[in-house]
Amino acid sequence: MRIVITGASGNVGTGVLRALAAEGGHEVVGLCRRPPDPVPPYDGVVWHRCDLADSRSRAVLDEVLPGADAVVHAVWAFQPLRDAGLLHRTNYAGTLGVFDAARRAGVPHVVHTSSIAVYGPAGEEPVDERWPATGVPGSVYGQGKAEVEAELRRFAAENPQMAVAVLRPTLVAQRDASESFRALFFDPLVPRWLIRLVERGALPVLPLPAGLRVRFVHADDVGDAVVRVLRTRASGAFNLAAGPTVTADDLATLVGARALPVPPSLVRAAVGALWRLRLLRASPGWFDVGMRSPVVDSTRALDELGWEPRVSGTDAAREQLRGLADGAEGGSPVLRRDRLRGMGGQRLS
């Protein structure tokens, strides 16, 4: 297959490239703002420079997409949160631009990588793909995902000749994304040496929000799911999560500490104050994503795609923590700290 991947050098895109390379036999075209060096898994990919926030991206898409068997859309701007216009141009307008270009080019299959943040709040029980996709309240990220998915549902209904799939992963982890995560969300308040102390068990007590529940999924498992969707030309939404659910106690145990429950309202207030002071890049909305995104059920991916995560949620969390402590970075510019520092806005693409 000839497969075009937007955001191919980012966290999810890197996992997709690994999975496609492992399967072999594909012609892969990567679109991103800063093409990576020709090292695995980025070698063997035909790269085109493309910034979806730029009006010139339409010409690039119209040049590259004709003849593609599928498009995998893996671009999403997380930062700068203070520039709503840039986020809208990249995320909302950019996504719709990719889908419209795929329609013009006659691409039969389009895959959009979304998030469980698209769901509205739920109770304790896992939710499947039928849960209302209204977005995490108060989160620019969650609301943005919900708005885009609503448009894609309309797009799919108006273009029945195209198969449209949406993947909704939980927190996507991999060692190579560690330094970019820290730079995107924790700079400048949380230095690497502090994370290293935590990861090596130097702190006997770890303050964490009471009631925290997080499910991880490894980027390579997301890549595997994408390949399975492409192979079967699947459509519709698929939750992607690896068990078990990781609680505050579990996170503390991973670093040899005891969790100290902190009221979520206090943590959110602290995050808000630090964000307003520009001491933290993560806004209160990101805290809401972590606390209010529901636990999801991935049964549909298992039944229809045969997808089973090879990395457990606990092991994915452990890999991410160790990567954060080590300052691990990947081979693409967007996953390297030297390209993140001092930048006004970062996008995983």
Show the residue positions of the predicted features.
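N-terminal Rossmann NAD(P)H-binding glycine-rich loop of SDR-like oxidoreductase domains
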Residues: 3-23
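Rossmann-fold cofactor-recognition segment
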Residues: 42-55
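NAD(P)H-binding glycine-rich loop region in Rossmannoid oxidoreductase-like domains
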Residues: 52-93, 101
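Glycine-rich NAD(P)-binding loop of the Rossmann-fold in SDR/ketoreductase-type enzymes
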Residues: 86-97, 143-144, 217
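Active-site Tyr-X1-5-Lys
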Residues: 138-165
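NAD(P)-dependent short-chain dehydrogenase/reductase
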Residues: 162-213
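Mid/C-terminal beta-alpha module of Rossmann-like enzyme folds, strongest
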Residues: 213, 221-282, 298, 319, ...
